[in-house]
């Protein structure tokens, strides 16, 4: 997924917004969905503020704004709850790309923050089906263990990048202080 994937569409839609007086909800829907995918949350918020009052009742625009609010608050549970919606064809592609991107980020965060997590907790947070979760975990080389009747998922242990030695850091600091004194 490349962030420039929708750059031409965004440029066209932004020009349309600047040039035309009255736009339909479709333009705002597409622009809002792409801003969310590109992680331009401030732009999405400002766009929502520019949406005319008569269009703010559009269900899809409201749903996209709820996604924006969830992303701004880093609330994955709300994000995954609000993204479960029957999206129109014009916003389906960027919303699906956004969903995949957010799931990747969620798994990356979970993998770095936890040594293990109960499967039901991750299912509840990501709102994935059990099969989807199993495929995602298998793709990331996560392992499963049983704790009675509950499944524990264990992320693949990531090796920490080699830390610089204290001597190297001390030498660098000494050189810097010497430079400042001269």
Curated annotation (Swiss-Prot):
Keywords: Cytoplasm, Developmental protein, Differentiation, Nucleus, Oogenesis, Signalosome
Keyword Nucleus in annotation: yes
Residue span, PCI domain: 1-167
GO BP term, pick one: protein deneddylation
Record InterPro entries: COP9_CSN8, CSN8_PSD8_EIF3K, PCI_dom
Top-level taxon: Eukaryota
Subcellular localization: Cytoplasm; Nucleus
Main localisation: cytoplasm
Record comment regarding domains: The PCI domain is necessary and sufficient for interactions with other CSN subunits of the complex.
Function according to Swiss-Prot or TrEMBL: Probable component of the COP9 signalosome complex (CSN), a complex involved in various cellular and developmental processes. The CSN complex is an essential regulator of the ubiquitin (Ubl) conjugation pathway by mediating the deneddylation of the cullin subunits of the SCF-type E3 ligase complexes, leading to decrease the Ubl ligase activity of SCF. The CSN complex plays an essential role in oogenesis and embryogenesis and is required for proper photoreceptor R cell differentiation and promote lamina glial cell migration or axon targeting.
Subunit structure: Essential component of the CSN complex, probably composed of CSN1b, alien/CSN2, CSN3, CSN4, CSN5, CSN6, CSN7 and CSN8.
Family: Belongs to the CSN8 family.
Name of the protein in its database record: COP9 signalosome complex subunit 8
Biological source species: Drosophila melanogaster
